[in-house]
Amino acid sequence: FRDPKIWREADGTYSAVTVCLAEDGSGAAALFQSKDGFDWHFVTVLERCNNQYGKMWECPDFFPLDGKQVLMLGPMEMLPKGEFHNGHNVIAFIGSYDEATHTFTKENVQLMDGGIDFYATQTTLAPDGRRIMTAWLQTWSDTEDKPQGCKWFGQTICPRELHIKDGRIFQTPVRELDAVHGKRTFHENVTVQGETTLEGIKGRVADLTVTVQPGEYRSFTLKLAADADHHTSLTY
């Protein structure tokens, strides 16, 4: 189906991971190989949905990461269960891969992002060895909701570096974003009582590192880019 991932192997041959519908009507990820990039032959099915993770699968990716192998894809029509939400998700199967037998062994499954419009991930390998991911910030179902007179509508995420720790994928903004940082503002040892305003933090774009000490509270909220009528809130 949509967006197979093709890459060139070290020996000059080509591999592709694709997705399809299996006999039970749910998704499957298949591996194909080619000597010239034109004539392809089927190798194996890497993973099957078995009606556990949505129905149709899209946008597959298959790559090594920190000693593990990752199969990342976007399931459609998922039901909310555990960390997964309804509709479109992006999930990663983390495990091992035997290149001799082309056998992928799944060890863990995780959601890549909790945003309901996060979709269609793709990764690339940077020259320095970093695995970098991009994705949509808006799905097709929202394309008719653009404001009147809007010249463009939709964007992709800031690229993220991927790493594996304790069997899960961790994501951080690419280090190149450090080059666009402006003035730095520090607040330390702040005791928060009710609503507290920190001076010097303003604007629509900010890179924040916030450390919160445990205390006698059940939740706290950060309000960003706030004016009299609007704000963005993050609640933990």
Where are these regions (language model features)?
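Surface loop/turn signatures of beta-propeller and other carbohydrate-active proteins
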Residues: 1-8, 18, 40-61, 78, ...
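Residue-level preference for beta-strand/loop junctions
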Residues: 25-26, 54, 204
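Beta-rich accessory regions
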Residues: 96-117, 122-236
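Structural motif
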Residues: 24-30, 79-94, 158
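Short, solvent-exposed loop/turn segments at the edges of secondary structure
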Residues: 1, 26, 57, 87-90, ...
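Short loop/turn segments that connect beta-strands within beta-propeller blades
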Residues: 35-38, 98-100
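Residue-level signal for well-ordered, solvent-exposed loop/turn and beta-edge residues enriched
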Residues: 38-41, 168
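Hydrophobic core segments of beta-strands in well-ordered, beta-rich domains
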Residues: 1-24, 29-32, 42-45, 50, ...
